[in-house]
Amino acid sequence: TGLITAARARLRKWETHGFEIESRLAKRSRSVCCDVLKHDFSVYKKPHVIWASIPCTANSIATKKADRERLRDYTAALTARTLELILKFEPKYWFIENPANPDGLVKSPLMRYLKYYDTDYCRWEFPYMKTTRVWSNFPLTGMKRCNHDKNKPHEVTLGKGYGGQPKYSRKEAKYRIPQPLCHH
Protein backbone atom coordinates (compact mmCIF):
# COMPACT_ATOMS: atom_id res chain seq x y z
CA THR A 1 0.00 0.00 0.00
CA GLY A 2 1.13 3.25 -0.90
CA LEU A 3 3.83 5.46 -2.16
CA ILE A 4 2.94 6.24 -5.75
CA THR A 5 -0.68 7.35 -5.43
CA ALA A 6 -0.86 9.94 -8.16
CA ALA A 7 -4.26 10.52 -9.71
CA ARG A 8 -4.41 10.53 -13.50
CA ALA A 9 -5.12 14.27 -13.53
CA ARG A 10 -1.97 14.92 -11.51
CA LEU A 11 0.04 12.68 -13.85
CA ARG A 12 -1.27 14.54 -16.91
CA LYS A 13 -0.42 17.88 -15.29
CA TRP A 14 3.14 16.74 -14.59
CA GLU A 15 3.46 15.47 -18.18
CA THR A 16 2.43 18.90 -19.51
CA HIS A 17 5.35 20.35 -17.53
CA GLY A 18 7.80 17.98 -19.21
CA PHE A 19 7.99 15.22 -16.59
CA GLU A 20 8.24 11.64 -17.83
CA ILE A 21 5.85 9.31 -16.00
CA GLU A 22 7.00 5.79 -15.08
CA SER A 23 4.49 3.87 -17.20
CA ARG A 24 4.63 0.63 -15.21
CA LEU A 25 3.11 2.46 -12.25
CA ALA A 26 0.93 5.00 -14.09
CA LYS A 27 -1.14 2.35 -15.90
CA ARG A 28 -2.75 1.12 -12.71
CA SER A 29 -6.34 2.29 -12.31
CA ARG A 30 -6.48 2.00 -8.52
CA SER A 31 -4.99 4.56 -6.17
CA VAL A 32 -2.49 2.08 -4.69
CA CYS A 33 0.10 1.00 -7.23
CA CYS A 34 2.58 -1.00 -5.15
CA ASP A 35 3.63 -1.94 -1.64
CA VAL A 36 6.59 0.34 -0.97
CA LEU A 37 7.82 -1.91 1.83
CA LYS A 38 8.43 -4.74 -0.67
CA HIS A 39 8.78 -3.09 -4.08
CA ASP A 40 12.21 -2.92 -5.75
CA PHE A 41 12.61 0.70 -6.83
CA SER A 42 16.16 0.20 -8.11
CA VAL A 43 14.79 -0.75 -11.56
CA TYR A 44 13.55 2.82 -12.15
CA LYS A 45 15.37 5.93 -13.24
CA LYS A 46 15.96 8.60 -10.62
CA PRO A 47 12.62 10.42 -10.21
CA HIS A 48 12.34 14.20 -10.43
CA VAL A 49 9.30 14.14 -8.14
CA ILE A 50 8.12 11.81 -5.39
CA TRP A 51 4.55 12.21 -4.16
CA ALA A 52 3.54 10.03 -1.21
CA SER A 53 0.09 9.86 0.33
CA ILE A 54 0.54 7.88 3.53
CA PRO A 55 -2.73 6.09 4.49
CA CYS A 56 -4.49 7.76 7.41
CA THR A 57 -6.42 4.70 8.62
CA ALA A 58 -4.14 4.17 11.64
CA ASN A 59 -5.33 7.44 13.16
CA SER A 60 -8.84 7.76 11.82
CA ILE A 61 -11.81 7.61 14.18
CA ALA A 62 -13.54 5.75 11.33
CA THR A 63 -11.15 2.83 11.98
CA LYS A 64 -11.90 0.44 14.85
CA LYS A 65 -9.65 1.08 17.86
CA ALA A 66 -8.23 -2.47 17.79
CA ASP A 67 -7.28 -2.04 14.12
CA ARG A 68 -5.69 1.37 14.72
CA GLU A 69 -3.10 -0.14 17.07
CA ARG A 70 -2.10 -2.72 14.46
CA LEU A 71 -1.98 -0.14 11.67
CA ARG A 72 0.22 2.35 13.56
CA ASP A 73 3.34 0.20 13.15
CA TYR A 74 2.57 -0.23 9.45
CA THR A 75 2.11 3.54 9.00
CA ALA A 76 5.40 4.19 10.79
CA ALA A 77 7.16 1.69 8.50
CA LEU A 78 5.62 3.31 5.39
CA THR A 79 6.70 6.75 6.58
CA ALA A 80 10.26 5.59 7.27
CA ARG A 81 10.46 3.83 3.88
CA THR A 82 9.13 6.91 2.08
CA LEU A 83 11.76 9.12 3.71
CA GLU A 84 14.42 6.50 2.92
CA LEU A 85 13.44 6.61 -0.77
CA ILE A 86 13.53 10.42 -0.77
CA LEU A 87 17.03 10.36 0.75
CA LYS A 88 18.18 7.62 -1.65
CA PHE A 89 16.86 9.14 -4.89
CA GLU A 90 17.20 12.83 -3.95
CA PRO A 91 14.40 13.99 -6.27
CA LYS A 92 14.25 17.66 -7.16
CA TYR A 93 10.87 17.85 -5.39
CA TRP A 94 9.16 15.60 -2.90
CA PHE A 95 5.75 15.74 -1.23
CA ILE A 96 4.26 13.71 1.62
CA GLU A 97 0.52 14.22 2.09
CA ASN A 98 -1.59 13.16 5.06
CA PRO A 99 -4.61 14.54 6.92
CA ALA A 100 -3.53 17.01 9.60
CA ASN A 101 -5.07 14.83 12.31
CA PRO A 102 -3.45 15.75 15.65
CA ASP A 103 -2.93 12.03 16.40
CA GLY A 104 -1.60 11.21 12.94
CA LEU A 105 1.59 11.69 10.99
CA VAL A 106 1.77 15.19 12.45
CA LYS A 107 2.94 13.55 15.71
CA SER A 108 5.58 11.35 14.09
CA PRO A 109 9.14 12.13 15.21
CA LEU A 110 10.24 11.37 11.63
CA MET A 111 8.27 14.37 10.36
CA ARG A 112 9.10 16.81 13.16
CA TYR A 113 11.75 18.90 11.37
CA LEU A 114 10.37 18.80 7.84
CA LYS A 115 8.83 21.90 6.25
CA TYR A 116 5.06 21.58 5.88
CA TYR A 117 2.01 23.42 4.57
CA ASP A 118 -1.60 23.03 5.75
CA THR A 119 -4.69 23.42 3.62
CA ASP A 120 -8.39 22.54 3.74
CA TYR A 121 -10.10 20.67 0.90
CA CYS A 122 -13.18 22.93 1.10
CA ARG A 123 -10.97 25.72 -0.28
CA TRP A 124 -10.22 23.59 -3.36
CA GLU A 125 -13.80 22.95 -4.57
CA PHE A 126 -14.63 19.99 -2.28
CA PRO A 127 -17.88 20.10 -0.22
CA TYR A 128 -16.11 19.11 3.02
CA MET A 129 -13.29 20.56 5.08
CA LYS A 130 -10.62 17.79 5.52
CA THR A 131 -7.59 19.64 6.84
CA THR A 132 -4.53 18.20 5.12
CA ARG A 133 -0.81 18.68 5.67
CA VAL A 134 1.74 18.47 2.87
CA TRP A 135 5.39 18.18 3.86
CA SER A 136 7.62 19.26 0.99
CA ASN A 137 10.90 20.78 -0.11
CA PHE A 138 8.90 22.79 -2.68
CA PRO A 139 7.57 26.17 -1.47
CA LEU A 140 3.80 25.65 -1.51
CA THR A 141 2.91 29.28 -0.99
CA GLY A 142 -0.71 30.33 -1.11
CA MET A 143 -2.13 27.17 0.44
CA LYS A 144 -5.73 28.03 1.30
CA ARG A 145 -7.30 27.49 4.73
CA CYS A 146 -11.00 27.16 5.53
CA ASN A 147 -12.87 30.43 5.97
CA HIS A 148 -16.27 28.75 6.28
CA ASP A 149 -19.03 30.44 8.26
CA LYS A 150 -18.90 28.54 11.57
CA ASN A 151 -22.67 28.97 12.02
CA LYS A 152 -23.42 26.88 8.91
CA PRO A 153 -22.02 23.37 8.45
CA HIS A 154 -20.13 22.29 5.35
CA GLU A 155 -22.28 20.63 2.71
CA VAL A 156 -20.73 17.24 3.59
CA THR A 157 -19.24 16.06 6.90
CA LEU A 158 -17.01 13.03 6.36
CA GLY A 159 -18.01 10.18 8.65
CA LYS A 160 -21.36 11.75 9.59
CA GLY A 161 -24.12 11.09 7.08
CA TYR A 162 -22.32 12.60 4.09
CA GLY A 163 -24.94 15.29 3.55
CA GLY A 164 -27.21 12.92 1.66
CA GLN A 165 -24.38 12.27 -0.82
CA PRO A 166 -23.36 8.61 -0.32
CA LYS A 167 -20.61 8.91 -2.95
CA TYR A 168 -18.47 10.57 -0.26
CA SER A 169 -18.74 7.50 1.96
CA ARG A 170 -16.67 5.47 -0.53
CA LYS A 171 -12.98 5.05 0.21
CA GLU A 172 -11.93 6.28 -3.25
CA ALA A 173 -13.83 9.54 -2.76
CA LYS A 174 -12.26 10.16 0.66
CA TYR A 175 -8.73 9.47 -0.63
CA ARG A 176 -9.05 11.83 -3.61
CA ILE A 177 -6.95 14.97 -3.69
CA PRO A 178 -8.70 18.01 -5.21
CA GLN A 179 -7.54 18.67 -8.79
CA PRO A 180 -7.04 22.41 -8.21
CA LEU A 181 -4.69 21.54 -5.34
CA CYS A 182 -2.77 19.15 -7.63
CA HIS A 183 -2.37 21.99 -10.13
CA HIS A 184 -1.34 24.50 -7.46
Residue ranges: model-predicted function:
Residues T1-H184:
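Conserved active-site and SAM-binding loop architecture
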